[in-house]
């Protein structure tokens, strides 16, 4: 099977080949045959002992995982809270008021940043944990090719995100202004390009630093990226779009800049070709990112339709937090499961305890298996995390969001429901992609973060709507009781 030799080298680098025994040999491009039940037909020599899936003494426990995750998670939440405050501020800028599709563009563009950086962080974390970046020459090769691939993806999908936002916005617009189309496309491409470059360099520094200090990069890389990612992306988008809006009379400026950034694509392709395994991402990795962008665009449509309505006051502030927390936690879990499979199995071969594609939710959240332990830790962070971030937002911008007890309860329930769904789907999608000999780092995280954006935006809008209904009903009952108590 393609990739078996590479995986064997990774296992040898980790010193775990003895524990696993010899790796199975398959013909190139062929997978193990599936059983009649749809599960893998795995020989006894290929099965991983069930005990190895449990957290052994001296390895990662819930306390260790929680200790490594909680600080980056809180930092990420602070960054997401500030991103929400910025979005609430930017929505009043002239360019956001005049170019309505800019607000529709926010979730897919922020989600694109998240998809690219989280998949990059996950790939680099897997490379670090399997010892591939310990060699200086190999490290340079992996880093440069990964950065180049991210730049190509950011440029192309940034343009597609603008097109998707325009298509969704066309339904509600009567006229089609080409100057606004050029502004939206150029702002999207530049934002995606610069944000991907800045965050990619940050990810590289974090993963290499974590490796040197003996910290698992899977636990800290994606949260730290999220702590600055939304801030950087929103700031660049607002500044670039405002700049081009102020120079809208110079008709050739936006097309010229957009073409200039697109013209850099061959350079990134040349750099990426230096590492053939990474180059495969450009051949087969487009569909997950584009589909995730489309899913996020529907979340952006919900945001643009609700953000200016009185009953949804606070939607702009809380959307980055709700979407970001869910996407953050599921990216951590996906990266951990992916690393686990890279270290303990080979592509196409699932460990015996993971052979079911649709596992029992109780196994996902209540077993002693190491991935179940991490799922519980991440789930336990949701409620206290959201309370802290909500409190910070109320301190800074209390008048922009309702703080009724009913809404807070609905908000917390929505956050838990979102993360439970995403963590379960993380386990399912990783198993399915690994069964197909695909890398979960590249194929699962985009789907899950895109779905997290749509779920987060939808559930948050539902919270505001239910709170408005319940408060309206309570006010109506209070008014009726006052009228009844008034003497004739």
Swiss-Prot record:
Keywords: Ion transport, Magnesium, Membrane, Mitochondrion, Mitochondrion inner membrane, Transmembrane, Transmembrane helix, Transport. Gene3D superfamilies: SLC41 divalent cation transporters, integral membrane domain. GO terms for molecular function: magnesium:sodium antiporter activity. The chain crosses the membrane at residues 63-83, 147-167, 189-209, 220-240, 251-271, 284-304, 377-397, 406-426, 450-470. GO terms for cellular component: mitochondrial inner membrane. InterPro entries: SLC41_membr_dom, SLC41_membr_dom_sf, SLC41A1-3. It catalyses: Mg(2+)(in) + 2 Na(+)(out) = Mg(2+)(out) + 2 Na(+)(in). Residues 1-19, 27-36 have a biased composition (Basic and acidic residues). Signal peptide: none annotated. It is found in: Mitochondrion inner membrane. It is a multi-pass membrane protein. Residues 1-36 are annotated as: Disordered. It holds the Pfam family MgtE. GO terms for biological process: mitochondrial magnesium ion transmembrane transport. Na(+)/Mg(2+) ion exchanger that acts as a predominant Mg(2+) efflux system at the mitochondrial inner membrane. Belongs to the SLC41A transporter family. This is Solute carrier family 41 member 3. It comes from Mus musculus (Mouse). The gene is Slc41a3.
């Amino acid at each position: 099977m393609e990739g078996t030799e590479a995986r064997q080298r990774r296992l040898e680098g980790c010193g775990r080949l003895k524990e696993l025994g010899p790796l199975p040999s398959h013909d190139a491009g062929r997978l193990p045959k599936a059983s009649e039940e749809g599960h893998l037909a795995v020989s006894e020599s290929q099965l991983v002992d069930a005990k190895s899936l449990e957290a052994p003494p001296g390895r990662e426990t819930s306390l260790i995982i929680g200790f490594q995750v909680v600080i980056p998670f809180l930092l990420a939440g602070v960054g997401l809270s500030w991103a929400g405050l910025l979005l609430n501020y930017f929505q009043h800028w002239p360019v956001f008021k005049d170019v309505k599709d800019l607000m529709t563009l926010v979730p897919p563009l922020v989600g694109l940043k998240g998809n690219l950086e989280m998949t990059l962080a996950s790939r680099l974390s897997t490379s670090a944990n399997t010892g591939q970046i310990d060699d200086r020459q190999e490290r340079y090769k992996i880093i440069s090719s990964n950065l180049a691939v991210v730049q190509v993806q950011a440029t192309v999908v940034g343009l597609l995100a603008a097109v998707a936002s325009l298509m969704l916005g066309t339904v509600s617009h009567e006229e089609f202004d080409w100057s606004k189309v050029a502004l939206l496309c150029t702002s999207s491409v530049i934002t995606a390009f610069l944000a991907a470059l800045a965050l990619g360099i940050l990810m590289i520094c974090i993963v290499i630093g974590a490796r040197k200090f003996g910290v698992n990069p899977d636990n800290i890389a994606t949260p730290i990226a999220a702590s600055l990612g939304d801030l950087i992306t929103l700031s660049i988008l607002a500044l670039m779009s405002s700049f081009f809006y102020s120079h809208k009379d110079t008709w050739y400026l936006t097309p010229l800049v957009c073409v200039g950034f697109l013209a850099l694509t061959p350079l990134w392709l040349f750099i990426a070709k230096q590492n053939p395994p990474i180059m495969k991402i450009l051949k087969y990795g487009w569909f997950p990112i584009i589909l995730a962008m489309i899913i996020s665009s529907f979340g952006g449509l919900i945001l643009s339709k609700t953000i200016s309505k009185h009953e949804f006051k606070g939607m702009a502030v809380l959307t980055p937090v709700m979407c970001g927390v869910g996407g953050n936690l599921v990216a951590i879990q996906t990266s951990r499961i992916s690393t686990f499979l890279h270290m303990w199995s080979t592509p196409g071969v699932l460990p015996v305890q993971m052979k079911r594609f649709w596992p029992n939710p109780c196994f996902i959240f209540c077993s002693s298996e190491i991935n179940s332990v991490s799922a519980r830790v991440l789930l336990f962070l949701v409620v206290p995390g959201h309370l802290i971030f909500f409190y910070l937002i109320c301190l800074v911008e209390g008048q922009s969001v309702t703080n009724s007890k009913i809404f807070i309860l609905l908000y917390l329930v929505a956050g838990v429901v979102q993360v439970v769904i995403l963590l379960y789907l993380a386990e399912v999608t990783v198993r399915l992609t690994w069964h197909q000999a695909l890398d979960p780092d590249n194929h699962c995280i985009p789907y899950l973060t895109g779905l997290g954006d749509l779920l987060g935006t939808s559930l948050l809008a539902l919270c505001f709507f239910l709170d408005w209904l319940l408060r309206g009903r309570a006010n109506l009952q209070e008014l009726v009781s006052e009228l009844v108590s008034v003497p004739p």
